[in-house]
Amino acid sequence: MKTVSTVAILAIFLLIVITTIETNRILPTLIGPLGRRSKLETFKRIARTLSAGISAKRSLEDVNSLTGMSS
C-alpha cells in the first residue's frame, strides 16, 4: 500500500512539472508530438499509465498471495 501512495505522489509531482514546462512552451521543442497535446490529454495519459501500474501491482500481489511468495 505504501508503494501505491508513493507512486501517486510521484505522479502528481510529475503532472505539476509537465504542466509547468508546457506552460513555458519548452516541452514542444524538446519532445515534439507530446507538446501538441492539450494539458487534459497529457493528464489523461498519465492517469491511464498510473492506473495500469496500480492494476499490475495488485495482480502481482494476488499471484504472490496465491503462490505464498512475499513481494
Curated annotation (Swiss-Prot):
Modification Leucine amide occurs at: L34
Tagged with keyword DNA-binding: no
UniProt similarity note: Belongs to the non-disulfide-bridged peptide (NDBP) superfamily. Short antimicrobial peptide (group 4) family.
Principal location listed in the UniProt entry: secreted
Taxonomic lineage: Eukaryota, Metazoa, Ecdysozoa, Arthropoda, Chelicerata
GO CC, alphabetical: extracellular region
Signal peptide: 1-23
Subcellular location: Secreted
Keywords, comma-separated and alphabetical: Amidation, Antimicrobial, Antiviral protein, Secreted, Signal
Expressed in which tissues: Expressed by the venom gland.
Protein name (database record): Peptide Ctri9819
Propeptide boundaries: 38-71
